[in-house]
């Protein structure tokens, strides 16, 4: 089990930012850390990886990553990392990149087969697409058979179609090797598909945690559904107002009375829900 209870304070001339978290992740769980930019997600991951220090305690199974007296170096934590930047060796082919991590040709071939990369194993990195490079990065991260895998928004630079395929590959890896996985993401659909545990960070603090259903499905009472959206534009039309909404990659609109419209402005994050036969907007 992964246990974290720590805080880190950042100071500059303008303001102070404190990251303070306490949570646990069971062995084999896929946990997503979700939140807006600047909420502390990547800093949390860097502390967990050993790239930054914090005050408190972090343990994984029987190993102390850090506490008041101990600090285990990143190399000794036996973690796997995958970042948005592939960080692959461009002068090596795919197979060589994996074997650089660990000289285990049998396991390298197993991973290449699992990630549908066998036909590219002699290809150089510059010959690969973005999605293929990220699969190589994932395979290389697994080569040393880590018990804990850290993913820092690894798919954010890829288009949606490629991203969806990579989600399937990642789930297959997770299911096959049962690696405890921590994913940093700000993509609701990605988190919902991949994770069985979600932690939401806001301004350096955990504001909610639970299963994806508990965190993201916010229907209550007689509500039929509730969808997170953002108001792109609020415009007056005759005696009503029209709210133009961004819902994922789709655009929709909802009619509001003048009384309802006064509670909203452009760029507000809202929940679009249905109650009885009416559509409702609620500010988050």
Task: Describe the residue ranges of each PLM region.
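Conserved ABC ATPase signature
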Residues: 124-128, 132-134
